[in-house]
């Protein structure tokens, strides 16, 4: 039985520990280590709910990782890599390739990239967004040249719930796993907002390079809109806080903020309000009426605004600008049966895995490598 080493660009959190089934590996008597290289990739990164455990090793410099690899028997290790492939991480991937590491990618966010046409992608793109797209293309081109010159290899095996990824081993999206555990749905007496901790989410600051801005105007806009929703439907709005959020309790007015219970909150909600989020999958799986919402502050992030437009196109539902909204026109809706099934079987699960659990798929495959 080979040792499993997971290398992450973030400190280990409770959520990562859960969706990657780390405790199940350990209970199966697998020798397991988590190599935290967050301070090398994103110096200064700190997350809430960081986990401390004896199997965690922390590295702040690439030479430290090199030394660890040199002292390890890499032929007897399966490396699960949770580090974004980009120009910033190129030397890290070269190091793993130089040491002939067996690399496994486990894509837990298979609904991030949506299958929409090039024309639909370009239809509403602004000039500044085109410049950003060209910059990203140039970086990808440079990265591919670097990989070719330095013989940087791709993952040996990839697990993913997305049908868009060729050669994958099918698994389920983590949200589908949660849904499978408790599929019965009842109507509660509330609407739920799927919070993304905008504009303070660590990914926005560290990975997308967004400058920290005040959330006050953004939150004021949401509070005003939530008042209108509550007046129209006679039900409260509950906030499903993002796992990385740090709220004091007054950000959304006198409204309940719940963290770590998004699946249950969506399951029992009357309707779902969101910008764009991987958690949209819960709305679709539980077959809930939903509404995509935006405002002036949210639109300042062109990447997120573009992602929301793509989601709108993919799901065929409109985006409501809550700063200029006529509530008589506001009408959350469910997806049609065909649209719902297309999304579920394209991004969340497959006919082969919908009755299986990721824990069994991953343990069964990885322990045989």
Label for each model-derived stretch:
Residues 54-69, 173, 180-181, 220, ...:
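Donor nucleotide-activated moiety binding/catalytic core segment of transferases
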Residues 278-352:
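Catalytic binding pocket for nucleotide-activated donors in carbohydrate/polymer assembly enzymes
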Residues 75, 154, 267-268:
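Alpha-helix C-terminal capping/helix-to-coil transition sites in glycosyltransferase folds
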Residues 82-86, 276, 293:
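Short His-centered aromatic/hydrophobic patch
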Residues 79, 103, 158, 272-273, ...:
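Short, well-ordered beta-strand core segments
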Residues 1-124, 200, 205-220, 224, ...:
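N-terminal pre-catalytic "stem/leader" segment of glycosyltransferase-like enzymes
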Residues 127-207, 364-369:
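A nucleotide-sugar donor-handling region in carbohydrate enzymes
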Residues 176-246:
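Conserved catalytic-core segment of nucleotide-activated headgroup transferases in glycan assembly
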